[in-house]
Amino acid sequence: MTIKPSDSVSWFQVLQRGQHYMKTWPADKRLAPVFPENRVTVVTRFGIRFMPPLAIFTLTWQIALGGQLGPAIATALFACGLPLQGLWWLGKRAITPLPPTLLQWFHEVRHKLFEAGQAVAPIEPIPTYQSLADLLKRAFKQLDKTFLDDL
């Protein structure tokens, strides 16, 4: 049974949480086969960087060549909307509760941090992907790189 993310979060907060999740998620190659976050993060960062200038270029180019204003604006809005879709997906993913298989893995990584003598924050009632990202980021910083091999 999949629990749906909280519906009380506004669309702006979802985008903010997506940006925070994108910054928090560790960009480690060993996580890429299991989690799509690495690919979504790379594409979203690319879109944030290059789509607004592309939108301005296509808008001015179509207007300068005598094109109609409607399609030019639609193209520019589409180009600017692509990175927003990535942030929206990441924001929704950040507030989604972990499935049972990942929940067990979450507790194992948390236990490894505890065994290493690191102070661990109390667990939320229902851990989310954001709490997994925070835990993994901390584990990659404070544990040796082979901690994933043992799990």
Curated annotation (Swiss-Prot):
Membrane-crossing residue ranges in chain numbering: 46-66, 69-89
Subcellular localization, as worded in the UniProt entry: Cell inner membrane
Domain of life per record: Bacteria
Pfam entry (one): DUF412
Keyword Transcription part of the UniProt annotation: no
Residue pairs linked by disulfide bridges in the UniProt entry: none
GO cellular component, one term: plasma membrane
Keywords: Cell inner membrane, Cell membrane, Membrane, Transmembrane, Transmembrane helix
Membrane topology: Multi-pass membrane protein
NCBIfam families reported for this sequence: PRK01816.1 (NF002493)
Record family assignment: Belongs to the UPF0208 family.
Name by which UniProt lists this protein: UPF0208 membrane protein YPO2564/y1623/YP_2375
Taxonomic source organism: Yersinia pestis
